[in-house]
Design a protein with these regions (language model features):
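Cyclophilin-like peptidyl-prolyl cis-trans isomerases
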Residues: 1-119
């Protein structure tokens, strides 16, 4: 969603060879876990756990496309930051999409690099 986030991580429907666009984003891993303390801000490139309410974390995540500090409730656990590749995030968010804000053509992350924490 331009000016907001890109979201992914559908554990049920995102891995099927024939994607059903009406179901993508509705799946989950079959488990939920508790919220964790939020440390940091929802800056552009922030990687956070998506959920549907308190203690409903699962497999879905989002990446902020803009600085959303103060615009999102602080119940989405932050667990990363895009350090390279915001140009890819911009391409995903600008892709043609349907009325449910799903891309017309499926988008998949095929690799990521996890860097050591600099703290």
């Amino acid at each position: 969603i331009p000016g907001f986030v890109i979201q992914g991580g559908d554990g049920e429907h995102g891995k099927k060879s024939a994607l059903n666009a009406g179901r993508v984003g509705t799946g989950g891993p079959g488990y939920k876990f508790a919220d964790e303390p939020v440390k940091g801000d929802y800056l552009a490139g922030a990687l956070a756990m998506a959920n549907s309410g308190p203690n409903t974390n699962g497999s879905q995540f989002f990446i902020c496309t803009d600085d959303l500090t103060g615009k999102l409730p602080r119940n989405y656990t932050l667990f990363g930051q895009v350090t390279k590749g915001m140009d890819v995030v911009a391409k995903i968010v600008s892709a043609p999409r349907n009325s449910r804000d799903l891309p017309d053509k499926p988008v998949a992350m095929t690799s990521i690099n996890v860097l050591p924490d600099e703290a």
